[in-house]
C-alpha cells in the first residue's frame, strides 16, 4: 500500500453573505474561495451572525475557516 506524503496546510478565514440563510452564506464562502485557492481540504464554520437594518435581518453571515495544501 502506498503511503501518503506528509504535508503542510495553510488556514484562512473567509466570510460568506446571503440574504436567505447561513448555509447559503457558508456555501458562497467556500465556492468563491475555491476560485482562487487550490486543493481545499476542510471547511469549518467558526461563527454565524446576522446583519440587522432598521430592526430587521438583512443578511446572514457565515465565517468559515478553510485549509488547503501549502505550496511555497
Cite the ranges covered by each PLM segment.
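N-terminal, polar/charged subdomain of small-to-medium soluble alpha/beta proteins
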Residues: 2-72
